[in-house]
Curated annotation (Swiss-Prot):
One of its GO terms (molecular function) is cysteine-type endopeptidase inhibitor activity. This is Clitocypin-2. Changing G24A: 20-fold lower inhibition. Pfam families: Inhibitor_I48. Expressed in all analyzed tissues, but expression was higher in the pileus and in the lower part of the stipe. The gene is clt2.
Length: 152
């Protein structure tokens, strides 16, 4: 499995069945510390709130940290609880597994490295909020949320 290079990215919400939906779309957008991460268009006033530093750790997992302007402290993709449809919080950065979607070069499933019997915990979108979605580990469950990582 190809690993993502460390760098600054914008993260666009797509799906495994439609990894390149064309123009437009919604991007992971920070609204402040301890607040849910949103999915917003890549336009003003959101543009500067959609810049993320993605770093691979020694264990092969990644942190996704907000890299925008005027950040008094470090925060990134995090969670208070990992329950179905719980929001992704901009908080103390947690580690995630990035799984490349087959037949793509820059589309990944973002998975929380949590041991749950029979399920994968993945980052998706509900409404305009990033949330944790649960899917069977056997790959069933249909179209899955994925993210196009576009280097800045």
């Amino acid at each position: 499995m190809a690993s993502l290079e460390d760098g600054i990215y914008r993260l666009r919400a797509v799906t495994t069945h439609n990894p390149d939906p064309g123009v437009g779309g919604e991007y992971a957008t920070v609204e402040g510390a301890r607040r849910p991460v949103k999915a917003e268009p890549n336009t003003p006033p959101f543009f500067e709130q959609q810049i993320w530093q993605v770093t691979r750790n020694a264990d092969g997992q990644y942190t996704i940290k907000y890299q925008g302007l005027n950040t008094p402290f470090e925060y990134g993709f995090s969670y208070d609880e990992l329950e179905p449809n719980a929001p992704v919080i901009a908080g103390d950065p947690k580690e995630y597994i990035l799984q490349l979607v087959p037949s793509t070069a820059d589309v990944y499933i973002i998975r929380a490295p949590i041991q749950r019997i029979g399920v994968d915990v993945e980052v998706g979108v509900q409404g305009n909020t990033l949330v944790y979605k649960f899917f069977p580990v056997d790959g069933s469950g249909g179209d899955r949320p994925a993210w196009r990582f576009t280097r800045e």
